[in-house]
Curated annotation (Swiss-Prot):
Function in brief: Together with its co-chaperonin GroES, plays an essential role in assisting protein folding. The GroEL-GroES system forms a nano-cage that allows encapsulation of the non-native substrate proteins and provides a physical environment optimized to promote and accelerate protein folding.
Catalytic activity: ATP + H2O + a folded polypeptide = ADP + phosphate + an unfolded polypeptide
Protein name as catalogued: Chaperonin GroEL 1
Positions of ATP binding: 30-33, 51, 87-91, 415, 494
Record note on quaternary structure: Forms a cylinder of 14 subunits composed of two heptameric rings stacked back-to-back. Interacts with the co-chaperonin GroES.
Enzyme class, UniProt record, top EC level: isomerase
Chief localization: cytoplasm
Family: Belongs to the chaperonin (HSP60) family.
Keywords: ATP-binding, Chaperone, Cytoplasm, Isomerase, Nucleotide-binding
Length: 544
């Protein structure tokens, strides 16, 4: 076992602080409408230019192991906020840095980190309760456009396309983002269905860079049991191989000999195929398989119905125009099922929704209905160069997540105003004396996002914060126009869910780091002495 190096107390916290600062200082320059770009070198191809906080955070790895621990913890804040709310990564990083920085000062002055943590936790909970009071539900297309625009770094085109997509497929509909062939960013609405099951083996992927399976005009085999023996599949596979078209198997599971044979055939190119597990469980799985069958014009192969796997023909299989599978999701686009059958199924599900008494069943039935009716909206992102394309696509994906979050939990004034408006409630909070410093840490931290937005726009953050604090309601600083405005009226809004997760995740990690008393890392290896100079002995008389 390699020797370990251990650091304690303030020495450990100082090392962590250095790592946190290194990462946060690189990320926070991207915040706000006047946020700067960060250029990231890539081992292959050209550099990436981005204004996305989580992209910057993911690239940072520090040489010092103790500093790197701090940086990685804050990177986790950005990454988790992105996964849960889709946006707010830079805000979360700034809040984590502010809470930890103020906390380390107080811990160094002799205060108990556990008391600080208790004070921080209680204060954060109060801020979240206040945010919920300030929050306002989204009612119209204009507000959806505004949220999308802000999250896409003030790109109004993206905001409008997202709101149009949501209007077309509904708030529960599926929206995907793809790269366009030209320079225009466009929206396509396609009938389709998405379910939360990915490929059973990564050897099925057709695009190794994105780890995705994309198929055109595939046959779709739907089976309600497990497939492990190849013998049952051989007759239908031979028919499909002769047709030259790809194939998708949707079954309870695919394993053993059957999976191995399909993978080998796929790699060799004999038969392009993929397999996914059937969505849902029990009776719901059977119902969802039937939904897919109706959408694709196929049949569910079920021994209960007297149909055996080794006796089916191509007419029993479903088809669709396009199939898109990731490790988590499968999207069937433009199924070949008849419109009359689909409408009949929709009517049946609607009747079940009306009759059910269980909220859970109703929710699941509505999900199935959305999959059958909603269709898929495809946003095709266009740009002049590949570098710009990747950056723009990342912004569209961020904006899409943020817009969904806004529809879910409502919106608050943006530009850091919502957090600032929780200060009066924090000031009136009653805490024990040993926990009050934790409250003061949060009071200082909630000002930080607005300070940074102002600083990135070339203004003195403290002056802007004081001016906004003097006023009430939605009054705030528009860094884009450099004016003080009503943030809601100006369309500068944040999804409540994004602000909430940013603060919760930041406080959680910063509190953990504050209460860290020891850090252990592998000791750096001592380099051995180099080879001595000079000529080896007995070689002086060699001729050259």
């Amino acid at each position: 076992m390699a020797a370990k190096e251990i650091k304690y107390d303030s020495v450990a916290r100082d090392k962590v602080m250095k790592g946190v600062d290194t990462l946060a200082n690189a990320v926070k320059v991207t915040l706000g409408p006047r946020g700067r770009n960060v250029v990231i070198e890539k081992a292959w191809g050209g550099p990436t230019i981005t204004k996305d906080g989580v992209t910057v955070a993911k690239e940072i790895e520090l040489e010092d192991k103790f500093e790197n621990m701090g940086a990685q913890m804050v990177r986790e804040v950005a990454s988790k906020t992105s996964d849960m709310a889709g946006d707010g990564t830079t805000t979360a990083t700034i809040l984590a840095q502010a809470i930890y920085r103020e906390g380390t000062k107080l811990a160094a002055a002799g205060m108990n980190p556990m008391s600080l943590k208790r004070g921080i936790d209680k204060s954060v909970q109060l801020v979240i309760d206040e945010l919920k009071k300030i929050s306002k539900d989204i009612r119209d297309k204009k507000e959806i456009t505004q949220v999308g625009t802000i999250s896409a770094n003030n790109d109004n085109t993206i905001g409008e396309i997202i709101s149009e997509a949501m209007e077309k497929v509904g708030k529960e509909g599926v929206i995907t983002v793809e790269e366009a062939k030209g320079m225009e960013t466009t929206l396509e609405i396609v009938e389709g269905m998405q379910f939360d099951r990915g490929y059973v083996s990564p050897y099925f992927v057709t695009d190794p860079e994105k780890m995705e399976v994309v198929m055109e005009d595939p046959y779709i085999l739907l089976y309600d049991k497990k497939i492990s023996v190849m013998q049952d599949l051989v007759p239908i596979l031979e028919q499909i191989a002769r047709s030259g078209r790809p194939m998708l198997i949707v079954s309870e599971d695919l394993e053993g000999e059957a999976l191995a044979t399909l993978v080998v055939n796929n790699i060799r190119g004999t038969l392009k195929c993929a397999a996914v597990k059937a969505p849902g469980f029990g009776d719901r799985r059977k119902a969802m398989l039937e939904d897919i069958a109706i959408l694709t014009g196929g049949k569910v192969v079920s021994e209960e119905l007297g149909i055996k796997l080794d006796s089916i023909t191509l007419t029993d299989l479903g088809t669709c125009k396009r199939l898109h599978i990731t490790k988590d999701n499968t999207t069937i686009v433009d199924g070949a099922g008849s419109q009359a059958d689909i409408e009949g199924r929709v009517k049946q599900i609607r009747t079940q929704i009306e009759e059910t008494t269980s909220d859970y069943d109703r929710e699941k039935l509505q999900e199935r209905l959305a999959k059958l009716v909603g269709g898929v909206a495809v946003i095709k992102v266009g740009a002049a160069t590949e570098i710009e394309m990747k950056e723009k696509k990342a912004r569209v994906e961020d904006a899409l997540h943020a817009t969904r979050a806004a529809v879910e939990e409502g919106i608050v004034p943006g530009g850091g105003v919502a957090l600032l408006r929780t200060l009066p409630a924090l000031a009136g909070m009653d805490l024990p004396d040993d926990e009050r410093p934790g409250l003061n840490i949060v009071k200082r931290a909630v000002e930080e996002p607005m300070r940074q937005i102002a600083a990135n726009a070339g203004f003195e953050g403290s002056i802007v914060v004081e001016k906004v604090k003097e006023n009430t309601g939605n009054f705030g600083f528009n860094a884009d126009t450099e004016k003080y405005v009503d943030m809601m009226e100006a369309g500068i809004i944040d999804p409540t869910k994004v602000v909430r997760f940013a603060l919760q995740n930041a406080a959680s990690v910063a509190s953990l780091l504050l209460t860290t008393e020891a850090m252990i890392a592998e000791a750096p290896k001592k380099k051995g002495a180099g080879m001595p100079g000079g000529m080896p002995p007995d070689m002086g008389d060699m001729e050259y």
